[in-house]
Amino acid sequence: MSTSKHIDVICLVGACLTLLLTMAFVCGETLGLQAADVEMGYESRLFDTSQVHTIDILMEDWDGFLETCQDKEYAQCSLVIDGETYGSAAIRAKGNNSLSSVSAYGNDRYSFKVEFDHYDSSKTYYGLDKLNLNNLIQDNTMMKDYLVYRMMGDFGVAAPLCSYVYLTVNGEDWGLYLAVEGVEEAFLRRNYGSSYGELYKPDSMNGGGGGRASNDDVKLQYLDDDPD
């Protein structure tokens, strides 16, 4: 009889806990529970899509940096983002297929990866630790990445924030780029409330670790004015 009473108590406690958890999931905001999403600060600044932002990269030996871009080694620089200066940041060329494509096209308009916390872990851009600057050199529309990231966000997918930026280097015109939130610690904290967890990144589109992949099946190409 004693054992039966204990089982009844355990079942009752379990049922109550289940009910409380269900209420927390269904009525979390009403009960005062906060969602995992965290406001970081950079969302409403660099990733405000109502304007084209400005970024000026300041580096003494820019020509020397370009000569070693294929090595993807970080170099120290300063960034002036919408008039605000951030010193002691780190920058390198980024990409696999796109990196080799820049040389193949005969120019030096690389995509870049910026780490605000590379030399000092306490430094960020309003909470943002990593930033990608995509050259969009393989997209004649210069819109595919932007549209896909925005659609993913509208569908509730944890997608990187992005916005267009007018890039200059030591005051020299470097063209229109797409600034993309790095999928790193700040991205995890903004979307999941914590910067710790499992995070995976493929080496290349074809999964082969650097081989060239064809984009023929996904490219946007003008065919005709007649939609039929």
Report residues per predicted region:
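Phosphate/dinucleotide-binding and metal-coordinating scaffold of catalytic cores
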Residues: 1-228
